[in-house]
Amino acid sequence: MLRGNPLGDPWRRPLWVYVPPGYDAEPDRRYPAVYILHGYLGHLEIWRNRAPFRKTLIEAADQLFADRAAPPAIVVYVDAWTSYGGSQYLDSPGTGRYHSYLCEEIVPWVDRHYRTLAHRDHRGIAGKSSGGYGAMITPMLRPDLFGGLASHAGDALFEYTCVAKFLGCIRFLRAYGGDIQRWWKEFQERGVLAKPADRSLLILYGVSACFSARTDGTPEIPFDPESGMLIPDVWRRWLDVDPVRMVSGHAEAMRSMRGIWIDSGAADEHHLDLGAQAVDQALARAGVRDETKRFELFPGGHGDLDQRHLLSLAWLAQRLAPSR
């Protein structure tokens, strides 16, 4: 699905598949599967990065299942890095077919090569930040494939969480005459995040490639770089893929989920706690039952999400396990 992508990024990708303790000892047993999505500027290797006094998610998941603290599950770690730093797990002429890659290539491959319970009721998806965004929208678009989700500070409520970031980008772009293409050319020549503007402008440019690329693949930013005014036609494309707004159009899909976990740090630096609240409220308006969803604002910020994955993994494994 990624062959011939517009950025020339590798179309062959690593894929990590974790199998729980006892997998080889019970050759006739099949397992639910949970797909894990990394955030923007993230990549597959982050899942085995070691932090002080903390296990990696892979180690923690292994301990979770070894201790029988949750029903055993297969855990699939997906790579969706691009030269812009991420894909938002969407199909776009600016980045490539990452939604299709996940749904049409990875899921069938895993089902063919591992003993999964190959049904949407036993398949979940989870992620943090932009990975949390992907975990929210993918089951909306493909409820035939995914029956549960967990989003940790996923991107949502764009008029607050995105527009707040645009203000700094407008100032940064003054040094480039308001021309983000000029910045991009310079950044490519440097090839490293070295200037204060780089991270913000890379995310703006990359997410524009995901949400509002022109047909030729050129990212189109959603505001006038001089006045700062939003460009209505472009901004509408962003709002169309805001999970808060998507819920109403995919209400039946959301009501069909076996479990929906939405959380964020209450002090999230990107105000994604507001996005999480708005998604939870949209789910309630769509008729998702309280017993189906779990919502929490926990003490902490955007850098405190890794510990949340283990909690939602245990919860999803329970929700997606077959009835005994």
Regions found by a protein language model. Give the residues of each.
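Non-catalytic cap/lid and distal C-terminal segments of serine-dependent acyl enzymes
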Residues: M1-R324
